[in-house]
């Protein structure tokens, strides 16, 4: 009977070993079916780059700056040399921007494939189909300080002179004063044309007639000239009589 027991013991040992081997192979097969070839949906990647402000040391502004990926879905911080790394990002398309209260940076779109390939391009909200490639890792350069306020305009004499109300009052006055001196008013045809043109402009009947004003203006000058001429002729005639 002891010999029978010793003969049954190796068979029992083989059965136990075969059961352990099968149980260890089943989890491996399940893991292989869900994970694929090692790069699957659950894999995460990182976005790298560097932010630069021309003429300013990184230590002067990086403490208040942040790196935002798709708003605040992923947040990164800048190192002392201006470089940054944002971890744990799945494949997809993301807008990466450096946010700083003192400097402005243009956003960049980064496309990550399922195999981990990176492609960076400008963000164009107007022409979305236009693609302008950028080097990767990202090199984000500041375009200057942001303009939070509009500069207040200073008052000048040109603003006063170019006011429409001032121009409406000054220009007619200049025309009435300078035009008789420039144009030959002794010509009756020229005077008649000027009166007709001014009457065409004077569409409001409540205002005084411009032609009457021009006639009085020119007639006063002509009468003054004639009176001065007659006085001169009278004096010359009196001299001759003497």
Swiss-Prot record:
Residue intervals passing through the bilayer: 160-180
Entry keyword annotation includes Endoplasmic reticulum: yes
InterPro entries in UniProt: Carb-bd-like_fold, EMC7, EMC7_beta_sandwich
Keywords for the protein's UniProt record, in alphabetical order: Endoplasmic reticulum, Membrane, Signal, Transmembrane, Transmembrane helix
GO biological process, one term: tail-anchored membrane protein insertion into ER membrane
Signal peptide region: 1-23
Composition-biased stretches (Low complexity): 219-235
Role summary: Part of the endoplasmic reticulum membrane protein complex (EMC) that enables the energy-independent insertion into endoplasmic reticulum membranes of newly synthesized membrane proteins. Preferentially accommodates proteins with transmembrane domains that are weakly hydrophobic or contain destabilizing features such as charged and aromatic residues. Involved in the cotranslational insertion of multi-pass membrane proteins in which stop-transfer membrane-anchor sequences become ER membrane spanning helices.
Protein name: Endoplasmic reticulum membrane protein complex subunit 7
């Amino acid at each position: 009977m002891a010999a029978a027991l010793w003969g049954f013991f190796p068979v029992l040992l083989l059965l136990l070993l075969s059961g352990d081997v099968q149980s260890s192979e089943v989890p491996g097969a399940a893991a292989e079916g869900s994970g694929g070839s090692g790069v699957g949906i659950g894999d995460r990647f990182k976005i790298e780059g560097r932010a630069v402000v021309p003429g300013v040391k990184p230590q002067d502004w990086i403490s208040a700056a942040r790196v935002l990926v798709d708003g605040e879905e992923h947040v990164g911080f800048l190192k002392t040399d201006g470089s940054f790394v944002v971890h744990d990002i799945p494949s997809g398309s993301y807008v990466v921007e450096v946010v700083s209260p003192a400097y402005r940076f243009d956003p960049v779109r980064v496309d990550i494939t399922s195999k981990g390939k990176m492609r960076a391009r400008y963000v164009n909200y107007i022409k979305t189909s236009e693609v302008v490639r950028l080097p990767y890792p990202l090199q984000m350069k500041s375009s200057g300080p942001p303009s939070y306020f509009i500069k207040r305009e200073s008052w000048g004499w040109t603003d006063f002179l170019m006011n429409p109300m001032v121009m409406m009052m000054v220009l007619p006055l200049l025309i009435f004063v300078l035009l008789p001196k420039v144009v030959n008013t002794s010509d009756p045809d020229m005077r008649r044309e000027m009166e007709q043109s001014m009457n065409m402009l004077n569409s409001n009947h409540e205002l005084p007639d411009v032609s009457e004003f021009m006639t009085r203006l020119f007639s006063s000058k002509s009468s003054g000239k004639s009176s001065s001429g007659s006085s001169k002729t009278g004096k010359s005639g009196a001299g001759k009589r003497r």
